[in-house]
């Protein structure tokens, strides 16, 4: 599936994986020079993947970027606040990071079942999302990329709430999110912390799980999200309001559901 599509779009799809992998790299490149002396040597092979713009010397101040390592131990509450802060500070760089045209190249259109399947296989054939850590920023990059390159309105990407495997709510999208284990040593190691975004994605997740994209063809035939968690679809599930609330409460999701509109 997707043979003709692959020939037509081979270059853009290959670029998408690199853009996602660099989603945190640019931020890291900016702060490394101030965190350690001789940062170019410490980066090793990773430095080759960073643009010259991202590696230019810029003064780093504590708290300027989220998820940067600290030299002095902090209280757990302070660590949590520090790691979660300033996500908005990098929003303005998203367009530049994605590197796509400002305006969509094709007319805007809604994501459909067939289009979701085509895009899923096309991305898979080009190396796509497999094994890439999920984060709120990478979520936005994928939305922006498909909007600008394919004209897909960015209202389609949604997953079940967890905890555990997050199934796509868009029927036909074949990329789910699976929890992955990151060792305690890796989470505490500053070098690993700089190079891997696993420590950043857990703060994007209300359950504190580290998630990665994984291809799964099953949702092409079975609406896994709806079958497993109909309560997350609200009135569209066919369940009574009382049953929806009961199920959400049992899963610890009622407070989250109250904060956003039930779909």
Swiss-Prot record:
Residues 88-96 are annotated as: Acidic. This is a macaque isolate. A lipid is attached at residue 2 (N-myristoyl glycine). This is Protein Nef. Homodimer. Interacts with host CD247/TCRZ; this interaction induces down-regulation of cell surface TCR/CD3 complexes. GO terms for cellular component: host cell plasma membrane; membrane. GO terms for molecular function: GTP binding. Pfam families: F-protein (PF00469). Belongs to the lentivirus primate group Nef protein family. It comes from Simian immunodeficiency virus (isolate K78) (SIV-mac).
